[in-house]
Design a protein with these regions (language model features):
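Alpha-helix N-cap/helix-initiation sites
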Residues: 7-11, 34, 163-166
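Active-site oxyanion-binding pockets that recognize sulfate/phosphate
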Residues: 4, 59, 63, 139, ...
Length: 180
C-alpha cells in the first residue's frame, strides 16, 4: 500500500533537512537564514503531503495539513541546530569534513559473529582518531530498541574502517522533545 504516517514523515523530513544542513556545512559555515530555512522546510513538507498517509487511508483524518507535520519537525530541527552537538560539528568536527559520511544512498554490509548485517548510518564523523556515528530519532526514547542498531553501526564501522570498537562511538541523537 506504500503508506506513511505523520510520525514517520516527521522523521523522514527531519532526516532530509539535517542531511541538507550537513551538506551545506561542507561548503559554508555561514549562519542559516531562518526565514529561508522555514520556507525550504515547508516546501519539503508540501511534497511529502502527496504521499498516502495511514491516517487518511484508514479515515482517522480527512486530510493531512502542513501544520500537522511542520510544528514537530521545526521543533526537532531547531533542537538540533541549537544543540551542543551541532556546535561541536560546525566548530570542531568540521576540520575533518572531507571524511564525513552523510546519509549514504545504499546500505553497507558487515559481519558480526558470522551473521550478515546491513546498516545505513545517518552521519559518520571521523574526529581525532575516533569515529562518531549519529543516528537521528524524532520519536520516543527507547534505548533497548536502538541498542542493537548501535551495535550494528559499530560493527559496520569496525569492519569497513578497520577500527577497534573502543574507538567507535555510535550515538542515538533524540531530537524531540529536546535534543539529547
Amino acid at each position: 500500500k506504500g503508506l506513511t504516517s505523520i510520525p514517520m514523515e516527521v522523521g523522514n523530513v527531519s532526516h532530509d533537512v539535517i542531511q541538507s544542513v550537513l551538506e551545506r556545512l561542507l561548503k559554508s559555515t555561514a549562519p542559516i537564514d531562518t526565514e529561508k530555512f522555514e520556507a525550504h522546510l515547508k516546501n519539503i513538507i508540501r511534497s511529502s503531503l502527496e504521499k498516502n498517509f495511514f491516517e487518511t487511508y484508514y479515515d482517522e483524518l480527512e486530510k493531512i495539513e502542513l501544520d500537522q507535520l511542520f510544528e514537530k519537525t521545526i521543533a526537532c530541527l531547531n533542537n538540533f541546530l541549537s544543540s551542543k552537538r551541532f556546535e561541536w560539528i560546525k566548530d570542531k568536527a568540521i576540520a575533518e569534513k572531507d571524511n564525513w559520511l552523510i546519509e549514504p544512498s545504499k546500505y553497507g554490509e558487515s559481519r558480526l559473529e558470522g551473521l550478515k548485517l546491513y546498516c545505513k548510518v545517518d552521519f559518520l564523523i571521523p574526529f581525532e582518531g575516533k569515529i562518531f556515528i549519529l543516528d537521528w530519532k524524532t520519536g520516543k526514547k527507547d534505548g533497548g530498541k536502538y541498542s542493537k542498531q548501535l551495535v550494528g553501526y559499530a560493527a559496520w564501522a569496525s569492519y569497513h574502517l578497520d577500527m577497534v570498537a573502543s574507538d567507535i562511538e555510535p550515538i542515538i541523537a533524540y531530537l524531540h522533545p529536546e535534543y539529547e
